[in-house]
Structure formats: C-alpha cells, structure tokens
Amino acid sequence: MTQNLPQPPAVNAPENELDLVRYLDVLVANRWLIAGIAAAVMLLGAAYAFLARPVYEADIMVQVEDNPNSAKSLLGDVSSLFDVKTDANAEIEILRSRMVVGKAVDNLHLYITAKPRYFPLIGAWISSRATRLSEPGLFGLGGYVWGTESIDVDGFDVPEALEGQPFKLIVLGNGRYRLENKSLDAPIEGVVGEPLEAKQSIGTIQLQVNNLTAKAGATFELERDSRLKTMEMLQDKLKIAEKGKQSGIIGASLDGTNPALTAAIMNQIATEYVAQNIKRKAEEAERSLVFLDGLLPQLKLELERAEMKYNEMRNLRGTFDLSEEGKAFLQESVTVETSLQELKQKRAELLTRFTSSHPGVQAIDQQISVMSGKVNSMTRRLKSLPNIEQDTVRLMRDVQVDNELYVSLLNDMQQLKLVKAGKVGNVRLVDGAAVPEEPVKPKKLTVTPLAGVLGVVLGVMAAFVRNALFGGITDPQDIEEHTGLSVYATVPLSDTQVDLSGQLTTRKRGQYLLARRVPDDPSIEALRSLRTALQFAMQDAGNNLVVLTGPTPGVGKSFVSANLAAVIATGGKRVLLIDADMRKGYLHQYFGKDRKPGLLDLLAGNRSIEQVVHREVVPGLDFIATGLFPHNPSELLLNPRMVELMDTFRSQYDLVLVDTPPVLAVADTAILAARAGLVLLVTRFERSTLGEIRETIKQLQHANVDVRGVVFNALDPNTYRYGYGSRYGRYRYVQYGYTSNSKPPEAESA
C-alpha cells in the first residue's frame, strides 16, 4: 500500500498581476495564428474596399436669418412678427420633418425601387466598369446582368399586402416584359411606355415602365414600399447639424449609391424647406394685414381730429412760439407717447395669434407698464408749464404722434404685402446639392490598413482566448504554486528524440533509447537530476515500487519511463521496467523487443517470470512488455496474482518502475498506484493543464493514493522567447479515445 504522506497545502493562486513577459510569450507562441487572422481580415477589407458599391454624399447649406429687413416701423420690425423664431434644433427638426421630406418622396417616387439584378458580391462591381449591354445570366441562368442595363419606372402601385415584397421584371424583347411575384395569380406581361393595370385576387397591380434598356432574358428587381416607411428611412439617413454654435447656418447631407438621385433628393428637400418657411410667413402676414386694415381708418380719423383741434387753437389764439423748455418737453413727450402707442398696437396684433399668457404678450405688457409710467411722469411735468404752452404742447404732441403712427402703419402694410406675396423669408438656400463626382466611401487607402490593424487586434484576442481555453502549462512553477506538488525535474525537448520517435513508428527493430544513443543529451541530464531526487524521495517511501503516470495520453510518459529506467540502471542499480499499459503500451519498441510474451501472460499464468522478462536490455535493466492487449485489463490488474508478482519483483530488484495508463483516460492506474511506494505524475509543456493535473490528483486521492511529485516534460525553450508563459485553465472532460482495441499511438517524444 502507498504510504499516506501528508499532502502539502496548495499555494493560493496569485492575484491578476501584469506579467508582460508572459503576455509576450503568448503572442510569440501564437504568432502564426495572429498573422493568419490579420492577413484574412486585411484581405476581407481589401475585397470590401474594391468590390463594395461606391457611396456618394450630396449636401446642402441653408441660412436661418434673425431678421431679413432692418427697417423700423410701427411694430418695431414688422417682418420679425412673422418670422418663426426658432433655434437651430427646431429648424433641424423642421428640415427633417415628414412635411418637408414627404415632398421629395412624392416628387421623385422614392418609394419605388427598380434596379438590375446583379450577381451577389461582384455583380455590381463588374457592371460599374462595363461600357455596353451584357448577355444576361451566369452560364445562361439566373438572368443576372453585367453591363450598362437600366430601367426607368414612373409609377408602381400594388396592394398594401404586397408592399415591401420583391418583384422580378424579366425582359422579353421587342419592348415587352414580364412581371413575376409569388403572390400573383400568374405572371403579368406589359409593354414599355404603356400603362399596365392587372387585376389579381389580392388586388390591382399598376405599373408604368418608361424605359427599359437590356437584352432579352435580363432580370430587374422591383419593389414598392409604403410611403410612410420610405419617409422614415429617408429621415433616418439624413445627417443634419448646425455649422458652428448659434451661427444660423445649417448643413444637411445624404449618402447614396446613385449620385444623381442623391443630389436630386437633397435639392428637393431644400426647395420644400424654403417654400414652407415662406408659406408660413405669408400666412402670418395675411392675418396681420387683416388686423392692420381695420386699424388704419381709425388712425387716420384720429390724425384728422388732432389736426383739426390744433388748427382751431391757432385760429383762436394765433401763432405761439414754444419756449426752449417746451420744445424739449414736446420732443420727449412725442417719443414716449409714440412708443407707448406702438407697444399697444403690437400687443393687439400678437393677441390675434396668441393668448395673453404667451411669453411674447407678457413681455409687451411689461414694456407697456414701464412706458405708461413715463407718460404719467410727463403729464405731471406738463402741468408746470404756462396754460397756453400746455395746450400748445398737448395738441402738437397729438398731431405728431398720430402722424408718425399713421405713416409707420402704411409702411408696415407695404412690408406685409411683400411677405404675403412670398417675396420675403427668413430662410435662404446658400448652397444647393451638386452631383458628387467622388465617392466618400469606401476609402480604399484607409479601409485596407484599418482592416490590417483590426486583424492584428482580433488575432491578439484570438491568441489569448486560445491560450485561455486550450493552452497548456508553460511554467513548472505554476504547478507548484497551484497544486502544492514539487516538480522533481524539467525535461527539455530533444531534437534527437524527435528523430528517434519518427524511426520508432516505422516498426523497424532496433534500440531507440535516447539514453543509449546520446547519453549527454540535455533531456538525459534532466533525467539524471530526477534520479538523484528519487534517491532522497525513496527514503520515505513504503517500498521500492515506483509508478509513473500522466493525466492524459501524449505527455511523453513512456519516454520518461524508458530512459529514466536506463539512467538509474547505469548508476549501478538493478532495475525492472514494467509496461503495465495494457491498452496502448509500446515500451517494447524502445528496446527492439516483441510485445509478447508479457505481463498479460504472467497474470494469466501462461508463462513463467523467466519466460517473460527480457534480461539486460540495458546493463542493469530488465524489461517486461505488455503482452497482447486484453479486453479486461482492469479486472486482470485486480487479480491476486498481480500482488504476488509485485512482491516478488520488489524483492528481486533495487527498483521496480511501472509505466501505467493515463489517469483521466482509464481506471487502471489507481489499481497499481495503490500498491506503490512512490507515484510520479508526468506532465507535458503546453499540453497538460492545471485543471487536468488537479483532476488527476483528485481521482488518485479517491483511491487513497498521494502523488509525490511531478515531471515537467518536453519544455521547448524556443517556443517562448521571453519567459515560460502561463496557463490557468480548468480541467475539461474530453474523449481521449483510449481503448484496448485502438492501435498503438505514435511514439511520444520528450
């Protein structure tokens, strides 16, 4: 039985620390993956840059003026009364509104899509470089076009149920075409230039094709979207923004693959935007004209009355010259009274459009209150003048105030008539949309390098993901830190052993033992260090039976077993090496021996020990092969005969070394390890994971077996140039395909 040694406590994993060296290791180890992904993404970017349909941008620029007329009048600035005082955000929303966009949709029939049917990905690119009509189809099939084919559809109306569904229009030749859709009762035929109307069970189809340039067999794609959906799509595509904060300049642009149509859409939007502004101002002016028309006769009558009273006074009292104080008072009084009357007139006009709670009306009320206070003050000052001068000032003031109001009102009405006639607006088109000549995207000189950068980023991400999911341990220190087990030896990868492994798979007889071929190989030197470590470890072991196992196949366990046995034997020990992997064992190939007879024959009692043991395969080393692969290896290992054999071997040799199957593949190892004095776990650089090692230890502990140490095999210093790297993975249950009926695997190398 294995001595139950206390398990060293697992050292807690370090915190997530920035280890630049290990990160560089991951990048170097996955350099070809990164390069491959970067190249693939760059090729995709280049393909997009050269094959994607060019996108053009058409733009307009409009100016929103605060006040198109600087003339002063009765109402302050009459045009400002009818200007829609809105900020840039409000104007942007008006420009994007369905009221404006809808006109462009209707005038240009944007809800109708009619285009040639191109072959996916490359068809449009080839067509854009063609100079003549093409022969339709791909190998005569499909109706794809490759040339300068075109279609002009002036009208296309379908039942609501068919809106958004694709139709196919096939050219028949001689000016005829056929319209197809799966929802139609039957294909519909029509003539170019003539209206088509066809009644179907789902509704009436109306189509007007004005022009069709293509050879017979060419196919075009037609689609009729709803007007609302088309407007919403156009609204989403519009890019509108103010050019500079509070500049009053608004820019709008639209992207599209058809440069002429894109420019036409923007010009339609600009025209309608300016027109709606003028129309709204004209409507406001009409309401104000009605108000002023009613006010003008009243002002004229008041002016005539004031003049009559003034003339009567002059006739009665004669001419009277005002003093300097009276003249100054008269001028000031006229100014204040005129301002008050203008404010009252302005308030009355605003009330025709707004309520008394409107901010504009309330602001006027505050000004009227202030101005009324000034008038009252002027009235009190007037009483300080002589009586005759008071009467003269009062009458002259009334005449001048009424005259200024009347003249100003006439000027206002003239301006309003201009506004009503649509000749004045506070919005003007600064720049109309020109047909763009150069596409804005894809930017070929930008897309490809950016795709390369993106590819590198994705490659780096893939490298770290791959390392996290599938990367194995690259630093033996990780094993010690995360499992508490000691790493007895780190065996470097041997190029010579790689060659020997290739020869081993040829099944040619010979000895392929690295310890005999190249005894000074670094891998063998590492195994000599392991031999020294074992000498000290065996002092605490319960017996001289050592079991070597691994978590999974392919870790180099057989290589370590064979060469370690040879190294110990050359040190003067009597060693027996047993290949107990009765499912895939192939240690006999290292020594140029046959598989049978072997351990199976001993357990079955068919052969004696002398008949099975291969003596002196290496001086001081005897060897027992597996024998033929049985169907029930686990049951055979549980045979009491196995206990007797192990006791016999332990008494005859200084050390008995047993090579067993992988722990996570089969249960055989736990049976043998339970009787061993020492169990060593062989792991492999970049293949074994911490999760697999932990699971191996766990399964052996369930069988009352403690793993004493670890051999870290096949370290490749050329893989990681900056350090060992790191792997913090979880054990993954996978199907190893490790069965007794499988063929022996290829030889493992250090």
From Swiss-Prot:
EC number assigned by the record: 2.7.10.-
Q: State the reactions this protein catalyses.
A: L-tyrosyl-[protein] + ATP = O-phospho-L-tyrosyl-[protein] + ADP + H(+)
Question: Per the annotation, which location comes first and is thus the protein's main one?
Answer: membrane
GO terms under cellular component? plasma membrane
| GO BP annotations listed | polysaccharide biosynthetic process
Molecular function terms, GO-annotated: ATP binding; protein tyrosine kinase activity
Mind telling me what this protein is named? Putative tyrosine-protein kinase EpsB
Instruction: Name the encoding gene, please.
Output: epsB
